[in-house]
């Protein structure tokens, strides 16, 4: 061989014959069609043996021509390698929860219809509102992302903002198409529920029992289909996920290509669902249009009668305003749509015995009576505790130790005592009464006028409140102290190592490493996490204080309005009422919290320990440099992630859109910018880089770079 031959380019592999390419495409289309008929429509059109023959033919052709293998092939539903862990996915459009109507009777539907009509400003003489009535599946919410018709990502709901990438496992669900028809939009996120059929659940548990009988280690049976489905979705090996034989129903969309970029135009939610069906997604056959409260009630009652005969678990029905224009008009409140509600059914009930009545003390000092029960299986779980809510509720039901009671899972989640069987009561059973002292710290327990609950006055001196207050402060949505979990906090408090929040920052490596079951590496990591947590934000710190009625949204509103913690601490109730989302009850709670000297002392000690955040001017006088400007980000920026850039633009008053239009002010272009950059140039939209964006963020409003 000559020297020249050594450096010659390798001969490219010949292209497969056109007949092979055409046969592979035909087999994939035919197998997809038969899978849809079998798994979605329940109308198989060929024998299983014929399906298997076609499948094996496709496998053989792909093995002979691996260059033709694609991820959307029917042969690739179970083919991924086991994962080490799941990657996080930030939802482009949050997966929000739906409000639950607590009234399980007909009045629940009437209440929702009344709220909708009031929100829309309708009179009694106006026609009924058109709704879509759907099933509320008892499964796991899922978002399926398709790009150019191919399934590219599946993500769990997570906290609504960030979920987990479970694409490999979702590919194993036969009802979910891997490729969409040609008329599907370029980008689409389909939202729905992953669930397990009851017959598959029974078969799974039977297989588990067989494994256990053969001596398999670490195997167990599952309590209910939902837990089995959730566990299947979170299997690191897709082969194990496939064994769960999960199913899927679609009920909506997230991000979707807008009409101006070639996306579909929908006027109603029902039209959207019918289109999803045409794109091969399973939609529950029970879904109906309903006009006004009477038809909502009829649907709720009809499904209630069918509930036990359905092949899968549901825990209620869902009502949605059908018109998408009216949905947009009604909007959201506290991250829940005003135009939708979940209407549940009365929970399953069982008899059991009250063994004791204990008092639990929460992080805000609330004393809650809890009935300790003889274990009973209710609604798919074993129940040993049931809340009695408060003194009035406990006395109204007259629950006593030794009573035989009816217990149910209220909303299929929180167990509660429904009633007492008085004919089975033990003679001379003493009546329950709330203690006047906190059972944890002995401080007085008081019930304020107009309140239903007793609360411990021990504040941060109460061990129960200390534990919960520290856990709340360390939560990932508050100040975030990684590694500070329940057991460690309990150990630190119970041993007297920490008594108040500032004591956390006085912990040293030596004191931590000396704790039982605390390795040196863990102690070192916690010290680093504590140091890292000192750099926080004002909203996180305010939320972390655990002020009653102050959640994340309110903490953010307070920080935006006042700009500085001292201004929040010194604000009067009247000044607090000027803040969005703050009403009289919340204002009084905030004022009461900061009127307590020990609370102010804790705040000052935390500051002295080095906890700090960036403060700004009050919203009323703080200029926002990007106010009223719309941005689109494309490509990879050199220093900022897309989420970081979006957060900074929004914090400066700007808006970040997903597509370029004539209304776009700036397109921020990074490396490998694509079609958005081309469209911006065609429309004459200003194109800037990251450096220019940073300059815009730092410039006064009147010095912005002109578009």
Swiss-Prot record:
Active site as annotated: 136 (n6-amp-lysine intermediate)
Residues holding NAD(+): 48-52, 97-98, 134, 157, 193, 320, 344
Reactions it catalyzes: NAD(+) + (deoxyribonucleotide)n-3'-hydroxyl + 5'-phospho-(deoxyribonucleotide)m = (deoxyribonucleotide)n+m + AMP + beta-nicotinamide D-nucleotide
Domain of life: Bacteria
Cofactors: Mg(2+); Mn(2+)
Enzyme class: ligase
Keywords: DNA damage, DNA repair, DNA replication, Ligase, Magnesium, Manganese, Metal-binding, NAD, Zinc
EC number: 6.5.1.2
Domain BRCT: 621-707
Pfam families: BRCT, DNA_ligase_aden, DNA_ligase_OB, DNA_ligase_ZBD, HHH_2, HHH_5, Nlig-Ia
GO cellular component, one term: cytosol
Record: residues binding Zn(2+): 438, 441, 456, 462
GO BP: DNA repair; DNA replication
Keyword tRNA processing: no
Keyword match Lipid metabolism: no
Family: Belongs to the NAD-dependent DNA ligase family. LigA subfamily.
Role: DNA ligase that catalyzes the formation of phosphodiester linkages between 5'-phosphoryl and 3'-hydroxyl groups in double-stranded DNA using NAD as a coenzyme and as the energy source for the reaction. It is essential for DNA replication and repair of damaged DNA.
PANTHER family linked to this entry: CHROMOSOME TRANSMISSION FIDELITY FACTOR 18, DNA LIGASE
UniProt protein name: DNA ligase
Classification lineage: Bacteria, Pseudomonadati, Pseudomonadota, Betaproteobacteria, Burkholderiales
